[in-house]
Amino acid sequence: MTDSTCPMIRNYGAIVPESQTMVKDDSELDIFSEKYREPVFASVLRSIGCFLGYACIPTNGLCGRYYPYKSISKGYRGVVQEFGRVKREINDGMHYVNPVTESISQVDMRIKVIDLDKKDVMTSDKLSIKIDSVVYYQVTNIHDALFKIDNVVQSIIELSYATLRNVIGNSTLEVCLTRRDKIAESIKSIVSEATNGWGIEIKSIQITDIVVPTDIINSLSSAIVAERQAEAKIILAQGNVKSAELMRQAADMLDSKVAMQVRSLEVIDKLATSNNSKIVFLPTDLNLSTRNNIIYSDIQSTN
């Protein structure tokens, strides 16, 4: 119902003033149990309200603010106040109120989302980034949400920003980029603990975007390229050292007399198995029996 037809019904935004966040003392909130002496004039006003309300019932709401039945939308809850004091809480539906002495404050009980604008934050490695995030919350206690905290939405925004700066300030850029969900969960835990007693529940906090400036991206890319080039040089140097070691070991093996004789025999064997005519020069360091065997095998193959 709009303000023009029912000005006594106020929405949540109208109830909570745009002021500095302030939690009220519990002693000021004991409005259900505190007893007080009602002035006689209050009874007179209540009687007048009842008369006007019942008189306006046949008009089916044409009397405007004096129509006694007010509706609460689905997903909302209301608090009925009389002379500034809470009388009862009401659910969605049609309810009778005294049009003179009573008013209804409505609160949206559905899950709501707050889109936090991008903020510049500094990581622990002194890099400035922009972070975009959203907060999902729900009112769970209408009484606390109305009377324990001024401007719930603004309070959640300021608390979320402060927590975001603190958590990101203790994390490196690499952690922010690779462990976004863990950071969001840490922020949610801190904000939930701080809002305990506000009559709300923080359902979720999500980091939707992390913007890294172009100059930081370029510098990081250069650092990564340099690091990979250094690693490649190290791998190449290690390969050269290994290759040199293997070549040295092979040279040591070939320098031995046994190795030289084996290689000579291999060459002579290849020559002996060839069909072409050949002249074989035998090394002088071979012993006589070996030379005779070679010559004999060569003659046999020729025949």
Swiss-Prot record:
Gene Ontology CC: plasma membrane
Listed PANTHER family: AT06885P-RELATED, BAND 7 PROTEIN-RELATED
Family the UniProt entry places it in: Belongs to the band 7/mec-2 family.
Protein name: Putative band 7 family protein R614
Organism the protein comes from: Acanthamoeba polyphaga mimivirus
Lineage, uppermost ranks: Viruses, Varidnaviria, Bamfordvirae, Nucleocytoviricota, Megaviricetes
